[in-house]
């Protein structure tokens, strides 16, 4: 791997606008912002496309369509960087991502839309890993630290801009335009990255440090696909959920440090706790848009505000807790207890609101 370039410029506004490292860092942050916005875009658009296509019973399939390919290609990102020049690789993957988005926007039915999501997921998974590799290999230490710190802030901005963009464009021009209107910005950011890393190359020794976890990745993808593909009315739904969950847990046990899922005291228990908290939160978060649209009859704008509230709360609290970690046991217990109370109260309010609808 070529060594990270030395830079005589330290991070500053002038260097951000006028140096190679600054341009690359800015492009990385824009891509991070768009990745965050994509999460809210998918959630906002999901009930709209399902209603138009008469496919409300395929929420699980549509949601899994982009995630399953991403699980498969994420482990490949690093290996790809050692076989092809990063600039060419990122250009090819960006083209695939754009094609997937366009296919989804032009889809006449949910089957074609799922095909577009699969293409986009294949590209997005590899791009996520490749972008991190490019940041590590292509930026000096000071700029790398800046990107890592600012990346967290980008998710706060994404929580504000993502739902506003998705709901605004969907309400004004339709959900199909929402899937593609942001693409020129993405293409421009990726083009800047490709230009700034055109001379960057990684040798094959980088990819030999650790074997690609193919089997766990396949098990994870298969588990998520199985859960998402089965409809609730299918008699095999619950057996499929059980098998899919078992596959996901097994893949986690192979990837995570030994003892994590058994809650071995110490850092492993902390990782497991974080895993389960994220799983429960994201599960509820995926239900916000369909429930808001299908059950509560909210408009895209109102749904966007609901998604913004959760996203901003998550991002702001994460940054605040990261800046001031609870180092003492008492402070940690106090903080986690308060978080658990907020989580239970919020989830309870959501359930009561949905179940309180007469037709539900």
In which residue ranges do the predicted regions lie?
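Short, Lys/Arg-rich, polar N-terminal cytosolic tail immediately upstream
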Residues: 1-18
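12-transmembrane solute porter fold
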Residues: 21-38, 42-44, 63-66, 71-76, ...
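Hydrophobic alpha-helical segments of secondary membrane carriers
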Residues: 31, 62, 132, 150-154, ...
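Helix-to-coil boundary motifs at intracellular loop junctions of multi-pass secondary transporters
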Residues: 51-53, 83, 134-139, 172, ...
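Hydrophobic transmembrane-helix bundles of small-molecule transporters
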Residues: 171-275, 280, 285
């Amino acid at each position: 791997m070529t060594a990270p370039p030395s830079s005589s410029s330290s991070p500053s506004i002038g260097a951000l606008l006028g140096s190679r490292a600054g341009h690359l860092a800015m492009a990385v942050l824009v891509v991070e912002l768009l990745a965050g916005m994509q999460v809210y875009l998918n959630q906002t658009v999901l009930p709209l496309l399902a209603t138009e296509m008469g496919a409300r019973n395929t929420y699980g399939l549509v949601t899994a369509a982009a995630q399953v390919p991403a699980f498969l290609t994420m482990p490949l990102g690093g290996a790809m960087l050692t076989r092809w020049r990063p600039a060419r690789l990122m250009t090819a993957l960006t083209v695939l991502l754009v094609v997937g988005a366009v296919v989804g926007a032009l889809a006449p039915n949910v089957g074609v839309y799922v095909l577009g999501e699969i293409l986009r997921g294949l590209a997005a998974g590899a791009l996520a890993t490749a972008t991190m590799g490019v940041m590590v290999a292509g930026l000096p230490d000071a700029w790398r630290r800046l990107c890592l710190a600012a990346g967290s802030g980008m998710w706060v901005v994404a929580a504000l801009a993502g739902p506003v963009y998705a709901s605004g464009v969907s309400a004004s021009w339709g959900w199909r335009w929402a899937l593609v209107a942001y693409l020129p910005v993405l293409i421009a950011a990726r083009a800047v990255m490709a230009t700034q890393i055109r001379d960057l190359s990684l040798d094959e020794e980088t990819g030999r440090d650790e074997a690609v976890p193919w089997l766990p990745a396949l098990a994870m993808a298969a588990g998520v696909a199985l859960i998402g593909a089965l409809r609730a009315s299918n008699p095999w739904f619950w057996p499929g959920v059980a098998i899919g969950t078992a596959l996901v847990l097994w893949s986690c046990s192979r990837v995570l440090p030994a003892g994590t899922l058994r809650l071995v005291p110490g850092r492993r228990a902390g990782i497991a706790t974080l895993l389960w908290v994220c799983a429960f939160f994201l599960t509820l978060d995926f239900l916000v848009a369909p429930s808001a649209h299908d059950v509560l009859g909210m408009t895209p704008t109102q749904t966007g505000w609901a998604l913004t509230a959760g996203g901003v709360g998550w991002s702001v609290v994460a940054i605040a807790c990261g800046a001031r970690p609870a180092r003492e046991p008492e402070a940690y217990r106090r903080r986690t207890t308060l978080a658990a109370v907020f989580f239970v109260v919020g989830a309870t309010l959501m359930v009561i609101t949905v179940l309180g609808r007469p037709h539900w």
